[in-house]
């Protein structure tokens, strides 16, 4: 029998580590916060987040898309239009972001 299935405390730790791997870098919470209530194009995200290298932004968006947190819609236009939005899985993370903002607001300074 697996240790994680037999021990809820271990399972909780495993889940926390997995979640941190997905959202635990410098840019991801800012990207998710920017996408919380709207769809954005690449340049809009770059402007909103500020200071992120385009290669880093592209890699992070691809990773979030692969994890099922962000969706990417490509429109057949010239020039091509690509929009990013939160998936249902990503929208489920909004309360966590709000909690992070509340915690940061309470303890900032």
Q: PLM ranges: what are they?
A:
Residues 2-4, 11, 33, 92-109:
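Amphipathic alpha-helical dimerization/coiled-coil segments
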Residues 10-59, 76-77, 83:
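N-terminal helix-turn-helix DNA-binding core of bacterial DNA-binding proteins
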Residues 17-18, 88, 102:
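A broad detector of short, well-ordered amphipathic alpha-helices
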Residues 39, 49, 61, 90, ...:
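Short amphipathic alpha-helical/adjacent loop interface patches that line ligand
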Residues 48, 67, 103-106:
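Amphipathic, soluble alpha-helical interaction motifs
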Residues 63-65:
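C-terminal flanking helix
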Residues 76-99:
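Basic, amphipathic "hinge/linker" alpha-helix immediately C-terminal to the N-terminal HTH DNA-binding motif
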